[in-house]
Amino acid sequence: MSDLLIQNATMVLPHTTVVGDLLIVNGQISSIQPGGGIVAEEHVQTVDATGLHLLPGMIDPQVHFRDPGQPEKEDLYTGSCAAASGGVTSFLDMPNNVPSQTTLQSMHEKIATANHRCVTNFGFFIGATETNVEELQKAVGTPDAPIAIPGICGIKIFMGSSTGTLLVNDSDALEVIFTNTAGLIAVHAEDEDRMIEREKMIEGRTDMAAHAEWRDDETALIATKRAVAYAQATGHRLHILHLTSGIEADWLNGITSMYGQEGEAHVTTEALPQHLTYDERDVERLGTRLKMNP
């Protein structure tokens, strides 16, 4: 990457927004000058960003690019291009591919593919099953001997059935995973037992409202509480994916934090734009495009 000076940009910094200059040298930010005034050397490309905002590249912590197995939906190249076009410069991809990515070998193959196809930074979760803890340990290590393999960002656990065949609902299996692995565990938090029971309530229905009634807020909250309990008992790093309800957010208040202490559970979560802007009242207008688990 050539050296670049961006001048007169409205720069979004951690705690404020200021107009100024930003200098990139050898592909890295070298200087940020509120108010401007950076003088570029002759070889440096200069961009006048007056009236424009300058933000850090965004990180999308949950994408489903369906590569390998279903490239007709999206693949690593098209997905990363779409990300880059929207200002997302890093993504973390999920393991419910065809086949599911549940072994270290499959992760190495996926990383090799990404090295040739992706136009952005990337990371991949290895999928947990009820019987693959040894493969998880190969990918992320154990609490006493953590491993950091470039391209592997953590373990994904589906606590409730969703797209694909990955499911870990058994309490003993969950305890084994939380107790015997290192790194980050990210969970799809829906309670499988409650979903099985509530599915009877919507039998025969084909309306979209049935989906939200079946996979309700309480279904998510039960699994969230369960995952946090395992994390706190083992001191594991935990990320609750796609938080969907106010009751979950209220319950997690005081539990989640940006920073964690060594050896203690560190819990984080995320909210997706669609969960902040749509609800069941929008289904009649937009239909199945709003269907998502949870």
What feature does the model see in each segment?
Residues 31, 90, 121, 151-154:
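Residues at the N-termini of beta-strands
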Residues 8-9, 14-15, 49-50, 57, ...:
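Fold-independent oxyanion-binding glycine-rich loops
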